[in-house]
Amino acid sequence: MYQLFRHGIFQMDAEKAHNFTIQCLKLAGNPLFKPILKSIIHAPKGFPKMVMGVNFPNPIGLAAGADKNGDAIDGFGALGFGFLELGTVTPVAQDGNAKPRQFRLIEAEGIINRNGFNNNGIDYLIENVKNARYKGVIGINIGKNKFTPLEQGKDDYIFCLNKAYNYAGYITVNISSPNTPDLRQLQYGDYFDDLLRSIKDRQTILANQYNKYVPIAVKIAPDLTESELVQIADTLVRHKMDGVIATNTTISRDTVMGMKNAEQQGGLSGKPLQHKSTEIIKRLHQELKGQIPIIGSGGIDGLQNAQEKIEAGAELLQVYSGLIYHGPKLVKELVKNIK
């Protein structure tokens, strides 16, 4: 059935297809239709897992970028995910970069996007989270607005952290999207140190205010040198971050040279990212020595490479592009088999 649906949406522009899918899942998540979706999917229960102090119903999650505004929480939840990471969301709504900004690399099962954190703002997302019936874990991925100067970037993260804290199972700090100018600079040196210090200080205040501890993860890029990766791992440990997501999209085109749309600017996700993200997970695991859990993301399209990420050191996994190319059966297969 999904192959038929895929054939239809692949006739559309990639972003229009995405928006159409979100609307379909929003409708399917409606209490009137959700039982029908669940009866079609037959999602297995999966294996519960405690990570970052949070009890996940199963270790398979939806990666950020799929449901930026939390419009289809219950629809995605019905597919069997143990957790959903919503966003990236910013303090105020923004349109993102000029269209077209999403491109399929069909022969490689990849996607290039240069969206630029298009979203309806943190308040809109929080309202959707409040209204959702989904029983799994909700992560909220936060970023900075495009026109906020880098020097004031931490203020945007703190603003979103304040808003999201009471409604999130965990929060992700996204400093690794290649589509917001200079954002990746926040991964390095004094910027990184200052940002993490400010976030941890605010987390302590919020934990006392709400009488609960909400873990905070950092999402990193795959395009890191060895010394950069070592430095990032050291900084994460020093600031006692609760988790790290490896990885975001890549700016490399090594695996897709010459293919249609490969020349488009933006972050490349999907199968071409598979090996690179697994290697980053492996090296990160060696550096972190089990002190901080890793959430693996990047190119998961089947059980074998999902298992490779677990063996490399990931404790939880996230999918997005693989869902576009392979449909809900991918989620079902992973939930059924990954522990």
Swiss-Prot record:
<feature type="binding site">
    <location>
        <position position="68"/>
    </location>
    <ligand>
        <name>substrate</name>
    </ligand>
</feature>
<dbReference type="InterPro" id="IPR005720">
    <property type="entry name" value="Dihydroorotate_DH_cat"/>
</dbReference>
<comment type="subunit">
    <text>Monomer.</text>
</comment>
<protein>
    <recommendedName>
        <fullName>Dihydroorotate dehydrogenase (quinone)</fullName>
        <ecNumber>1.3.5.2</ecNumber>
    </recommendedName>
</protein>
<dbReference type="GO" id="GO:0006207">
    <property type="term" value="P:'de novo' pyrimidine nucleobase biosynthetic process"/>
</dbReference>
<feature type="binding site">
    <location>
        <position position="88"/>
    </location>
    <ligand>
        <name>FMN</name>
    </ligand>
</feature>
<feature type="binding site">
    <location>
        <begin position="248"/>
        <end position="249"/>
    </location>
    <ligand>
        <name>substrate</name>
    </ligand>
</feature>
<feature type="binding site">
    <location>
        <position position="174"/>
    </location>
    <ligand>
        <name>FMN</name>
    </ligand>
</feature>
<keyword id="KW-0288">FMN</keyword>
<feature type="binding site">
    <location>
        <position position="219"/>
    </location>
    <ligand>
        <name>FMN</name>
    </ligand>
</feature>
<comment type="function">
    <text>Catalyzes the conversion of dihydroorotate to orotate with quinone as electron acceptor.</text>
</comment>
<feature type="active site" description="Nucleophile">
    <location>
        <position position="177"/>
    </location>
</feature>
<dbReference type="InterPro" id="IPR012135">
    <property type="entry name" value="Dihydroorotate_DH_1_2"/>
</dbReference>
<comment type="pathway">
    <text>Pyrimidine metabolism; UMP biosynthesis via de novo pathway; orotate from (S)-dihydroorotate (quinone route): step 1/1.</text>
</comment>
<dbReference type="InterPro" id="IPR001295">
    <property type="entry name" value="Dihydroorotate_DH_CS"/>
</dbReference>
<feature type="binding site">
    <location>
        <position position="179"/>
    </location>
    <ligand>
        <name>substrate</name>
    </ligand>
</feature>
<feature type="binding site">
    <location>
        <position position="141"/>
    </location>
    <ligand>
        <name>FMN</name>
    </ligand>
</feature>
<keyword id="KW-0560">Oxidoreductase</keyword>
<feature type="binding site">
    <location>
        <position position="174"/>
    </location>
    <ligand>
        <name>substrate</name>
    </ligand>
</feature>
<dbReference type="GO" id="GO:0005737">
    <property type="term" value="C:cytoplasm"/>
</dbReference>
<comment type="similarity">
    <text>Belongs to the dihydroorotate dehydrogenase family. Type 2 subfamily.</text>
</comment>
<dbReference type="GO" id="GO:0044205">
    <property type="term" value="P:'de novo' UMP biosynthetic process"/>
</dbReference>
<feature type="binding site">
    <location>
        <position position="299"/>
    </location>
    <ligand>
        <name>FMN</name>
    </ligand>
</feature>
<dbReference type="InterPro" id="IPR050074">
    <property type="entry name" value="DHO_dehydrogenase"/>
</dbReference>
<feature type="binding site">
    <location>
        <position position="270"/>
    </location>
    <ligand>
        <name>FMN</name>
    </ligand>
</feature>
<keyword id="KW-0665">Pyrimidine biosynthesis</keyword>
<dbReference type="InterPro" id="IPR013785">
    <property type="entry name" value="Aldolase_TIM"/>
</dbReference>
<feature type="binding site">
    <location>
        <begin position="320"/>
        <end position="321"/>
    </location>
    <ligand>
        <name>FMN</name>
    </ligand>
</feature>
<keyword id="KW-0285">Flavoprotein</keyword>
<dbReference type="GO" id="GO:0005886">
    <property type="term" value="C:plasma membrane"/>
</dbReference>
<dbReference type="InterPro" id="IPR005719">
    <property type="entry name" value="Dihydroorotate_DH_2"/>
</dbReference>
<keyword id="KW-1003">Cell membrane</keyword>
<dbReference type="Pfam" id="PF01180">
    <property type="entry name" value="DHO_dh"/>
</dbReference>
<feature type="binding site">
    <location>
        <begin position="64"/>
        <end position="68"/>
    </location>
    <ligand>
        <name>FMN</name>
    </ligand>
</feature>
<feature type="binding site">
    <location>
        <position position="247"/>
    </location>
    <ligand>
        <name>FMN</name>
    </ligand>
</feature>
<dbReference type="GO" id="GO:0106430">
    <property type="term" value="F:dihydroorotate dehydrogenase (quinone) activity"/>
</dbReference>
<feature type="binding site">
    <location>
        <begin position="113"/>
        <end position="117"/>
    </location>
    <ligand>
        <name>substrate</name>
    </ligand>
</feature>
<keyword id="KW-0472">Membrane</keyword>
